[in-house]
């Protein structure tokens, strides 16, 4: 009941509709004038069913013309035969909404014969995008048993695509592939699985640091404008990941920018004073780093070692328990790491990659250092 054909440049009328089969005529000793020598194509064989042609613009114009009669009169014509075969077929055609290549186009009379044109669009909400990724991602049962991906990780990955669609370095019309989040989610799970195998762990979860593994998925799924090419695909992808962390951080914890602002309060008609702000919930964390402490998180770090390292930071566990009192040990550890990346995204602490590890330090001390504050592409490539 279902037939499908990918429109490649080598598709012919014979493939779709049919042609005379000389071998069949010779074997059956039939004249070419006999209708029995006809070899029917995929469309007649899909009668009383659904037939789909994918990537319609790739179909040559002369082949598209051969579909006119089928769509309008509902019959087929093969060679010189006076053959009228009524067909009962539901035709479906697919094409990219933004065809920015020079491969061809849909001829106007054929487009006129297509009864309805449904225009697709990117998912309007994170929830819709999450459902699509969950449905399409190819995560094996063994991976699901070994690796747990929290809702936070899934939303961060989806947010990357939303950030890309509004990014100045990414082409606005067709710069973001619909497969970006699917490939990124699979890459994140694979990164966590690889780490678990290295340390012989029975199960693990996807950490924020594992999202460094989705950078190749992002660079291969976005089309950059000229300025983006100058910036570099890797830097743009890393910037998108950091922006998604920054955007999503305020959905889980207080906005650090709001805490920096001091509200003026009128004291009298002639005097104004600044209202004293309550101490920031991140004060203990930033003070710990200001005291000269630093935290190193290896990309291939064991879960147990990472949790121990996170608990060294003063106030980190406290802020997670304050806003997420119901979080279990695994969730709390992930949120603790998320807080560090979030504070780095809001420039309260610094974050940089050195030899396969993420180093968190105080911002002032890092500014005195001439090193970069971001992941280095060469460092990451060592861990592929």
Regions found by a protein language model. Name each.
Residues 101-105, 111-174, 196-201, 226-231, ...:
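Conserved C-terminal "switch" segment of AAA+ ATPases
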Residues 173-179, 330:
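Structural motif
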Residues 14, 65, 151, 155, ...:
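Non-catalytic, well-ordered alpha-helical scaffold segments
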